Amino acid sequence: MLNLARMVDIKPQSGTHVAPINLKLMEMEQFARYTLEKEILNRLRGRVTPRQEEEYRSNIETYRVLEADMSQPDRTARMLELDNAFHRKSFELCGMEAHYDHMLASLQHVERIRKFSLQTEENKSVCSSHTAILEALLHGSADDVSEALESHLSRYKQSVAQARSVHPEYFIDE
């Protein structure tokens, strides 16, 4: 399975090695994610209840507090969980959470970069990006939702640039 997902390279008589992050596959994964998530957000746009809005805002605030406290145990894993919960929320509210779970499971190369980005300065924009998505969801047009989501999901390019400058051997452009 990992070989099919291009997560490992199997070399007969030599062994199995972690495959470099395939930037072309990562771009495809990210486009599929953007397309699906944009559709879900637009189905929900303008229909979020005050209680649901508060749940979104609570998630953002919890993330902000965790982000500021480097001493928190399991901080990186918890931040990733909060990020996933923020994005999954719109799928849940549309009754399509299984679609989110399936999508997340298919994002092999993107997930590797997401985990790296939690340890960089680029990560500092998550709360403001999530707030922009929420505001577009509450009060914006389809174009506003699209722009906020595109801005947020394209952050991975900065993470790739940072990681690639330090470890170019971790990436391939195939």
Describe these PLM feature segments.
Residues 22, 117-120:
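Solvent-exposed, flexible loop/coil residues
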Residues 122-124:
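Active-site loop of classical SDR/Rossmann-like NAD(P)-dependent oxidoreductases
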